[in-house]
């Protein structure tokens, strides 16, 4: 049985994109908190969401299904979108196994996902 300890952090980029950092194991018990955060900002017309999964170890199938259904709602009702960034390990294998690429787009990095929404992160190099 999977330990359903989870952490969720978020930030808003340029008043148009929410980046949700899902950490540890995301199980059905974590869905109310995820929904609360997303709906708070949807009411403020922030309807583009990036799920950053760099520190996520596991996502329960019901959560994947929720994100797929919610993406359809965003596309149809709010002209928004959900994308993924920084997947690795078991989360990446599940994404591939469940053929979720047909439903939710994935980006290798957060910068790539932000660029998808027209946000350019300028990185300075020495």
Language-model-detected regions and their locations in the chain:
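STAS-typified acidic loop motif
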Residues: 2-39, 53-55
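Short, solvent-exposed coil/turn elements at secondary-structure transition points
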Residues: 25, 88, 110-112
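Amphipathic alpha-helical interaction surfaces in cytosolic regulatory modules
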Residues: 28-104
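A cross-taxonomic marker for long C-terminal extensions/tails that follow the last structured domain
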Residues: 114-126
